[in-house]
């Protein structure tokens, strides 16, 4: 398969690039793409930048330039579910915006003319969860659930509670997954998001867990994505 992987931040991109074999860098339309292989799959990686617009542009450039069979959004996210622990991974069953409102004729989070949520193909969710069953598994636990996205770095309990008021089933919150999912929906390209939990706002104060994650725990967090790719 040909797999496109999109991350937002340079810290995430630096870790992901180490997973590639035979890598090389290409420059397209002001963006760098790194190509290589993982588990026999052709892989294209891109750092899109933070937020919905950057990630949508990145997804269009990825799809238009490389025509991947699957697009993966990966990176860190806040845990919406208080049962989650830092370094555990949430794989999307569906993505939705937590900051969109288009009137009473739409569900909260729905863009007019688009689905209320953007579902991940179940076969990819099942493959992701199967990593948990590896003999001698040393990867962080993978859970499946709803990922909500918006233009907000959630660093307070109050903001997290306001999101959960609308989306009580949310498991993780980020700034890119749903915009990439919407782009992939329009371009009819399968999509899945892997989000490594860097902090759980309802168990945190002023994002201290987030900063501790990058200082102490980030190394190796993206190995789960590699294990998933090796199953495709």
Residue ranges and their predicted role:
Residues 1-60, 65-66:
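N-terminal short beta-loop-beta anion/metal-coordinating cradle
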Residues 43-48, 146-148, 194:
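Active-site-proximal beta-strand elements of phosphoester/diester hydrolases
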Residues 61-65, 83-84, 181-190:
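Alpha-helix C-terminal capping segments
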Residues 67-72:
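Proline-aspartate-enriched helix->loop->beta-strand connector
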Residues 80-167:
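Mid-sequence, gly/pro-rich, charge-dense loop/helix-turn segments that line enzyme active sites
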Residues 152-202, 206:
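A C-terminal functional module that forms or caps the active site or interfaces directly
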Residues 201-232:
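His/Asp/Glu-rich mid-to-C-terminal helical/loop segments that flank catalytic regions of hydrolases
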């Amino acid at each position: 398969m040909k797999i496109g992987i999109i991350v937002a931040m340079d810290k995430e991109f630096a870790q992901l690039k180490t997973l590639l074999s035979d890598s090389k860098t290409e420059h397209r339309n002001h963006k760098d793409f790194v190509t290589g292989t993982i588990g026999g799959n052709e892989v294209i990686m891109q750092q899109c930048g933070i937020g919905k617009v950057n990630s949508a542009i990145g997804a269009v450039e990825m799809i238009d330039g490389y025509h991947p069979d699957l697009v993966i959004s990966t990176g860190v996210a806040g845990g919406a579910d208080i049962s989650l622990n830092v370094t555990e991974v949430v794989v999307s069953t569906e993505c939705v915006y937590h900051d969109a409102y288009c009137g009473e004729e739409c569900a909260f989070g729905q863009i007019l003319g688009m689905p209320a949520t953007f579902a991940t193909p179940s076969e990819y969710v099942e493959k992701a969860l199967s990593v948990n069953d590896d003999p001698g598994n040393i990867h962080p636990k993978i859970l499946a659930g709803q990922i909500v996205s918006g233009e907000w770095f959630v660093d307070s309990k109050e903001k997290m509670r306001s999101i959960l008021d609308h989306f009580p089933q949310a498991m993780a919150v980020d700034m890119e997954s749903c915009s990439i999912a919407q782009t992939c929906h329009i371009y009819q390209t399968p999509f899945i998001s892997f989000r490594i939990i860097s902090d759980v706002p309802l168990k945190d104060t002023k994002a201290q867990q987030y900063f501790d994650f990058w200082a102490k725990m980030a190394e190796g967090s993206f190995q789960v994505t590699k294990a998933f790719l090796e199953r495709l």
